[in-house]
Amino acid sequence: MFKLLKAEGNARRGEFTCAHGTVQTPVFMNVGTQGAIKGALSAEDLKNIGCQVELSNTYHLHLRPTDKVVREMGGLHKFMTWDGPILTDSGGFQVFSLSSLRKIKEEGVYFASHIDGRKIFMGPEESMQIQSNLGSDICMAFDECIENPSPRDYVRKSVDRTYRWLVRCKAENARLNSLPDTVNPQQMLWGINQGSTYADIRIDHMKRIADLDLPGYAIGGLAVGETAEEMYDIIEAVEPYMPADKTRYLMGVGTPTNIIEAVARGVDFFDCVMPARNARHARLFTWEGAINLKNAKYQLDESPIDPKCDCPVCRRYSRAYIRHLFVAEEMLAMRLAVMHNLYFYNKLMEKIRNALDSGEFEAFRREYSEKLNRRI
């Protein structure tokens, strides 16, 4: 459960406790889509770079190796040898973004696998069963991820259906948690706010899902085409209606600047594939801004990726060496780059928490919000 420790404006410093530990918030969840970080990082690596929460994907694990296999192996924690908290998303985003020939019905969604084209059905109960088999600490509600922009009439109908699906998710999560052989009987369900960029629809939906008294709530359907300012406006509109005693999660966001600005608006949890994805293409974060290590100017650069960084990579390797690895297409390049970028994100959250602890978050925001958005 969530405990608010301190606040500065709307920014919140807190703790979230679940079956596998206590999380210091604000926090960035490191994304291991298929039970692993893309870039060859292990669960041990995650511990060494300060990861608190690992996020895995319901849709992908349902397809491979299947959630039933993971259950037979004792759950996702045991399967991937990660003993910290795990959040699994519902699979909804992937159903709507990856799958072809999808058909949305009241009971759920019929779609074709992006791997082999086989027909699959997923509804609220199926998503809850899959996530129960995985045994995550936090399971996300099954929702429809709406494209931006979408017609207002369709958005209204969609969020009404997403609300009805959430009611079904809550009932099924409670039923599964009560079973004697469930993997994690303390699994918590978080609801997801939708509504595209229509603030009034977002607010109405947030009010309704808040009445269901869930342990946490997410803002979904952002960072999918709207501007950063539109995203911030939606957060500001919805935040007053998010329960103050529950965790708040902004799904799929974002850049370091996005995170700082969302923390300032009251968000506690974040996730994004971007730091690892950027790293795999030699785009690396530093405390002065982002660099592209494939640039020829780094060919003879003996300095670390970031002289201000104390990650395992920056303590040992030069820009010139890692650039060489990328040019030579060595696998080690991706591993070192991903390790650095995820360490940077975890350290960013630590600095944000420290700033909140000392009452200096606004000063931190002024110093870094714009600086971290630039390319050098």
Predicted regions and their residues:
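Hydrophobic alpha-helical packing residues
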Residues: 21, 162-169, 209, 238, ...
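Glycine- and acidic
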Residues: 148-152, 156, 216-222, 331-334
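Conserved, mostly hydrophobic/aromatic
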Residues: 21, 54, 89, 131, ...
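C-terminal extensions of enzymes
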Residues: 1-15, 23-32, 39-40, 143-149, ...
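Non-catalytic, usually N-terminal nucleic-acid engagement modules in DNA/RNA processing proteins
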Residues: 1-183, 296-299
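Generic secondary-structure signature for well-ordered alpha-helical cores
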Residues: 136, 167, 171-174, 240-243, ...
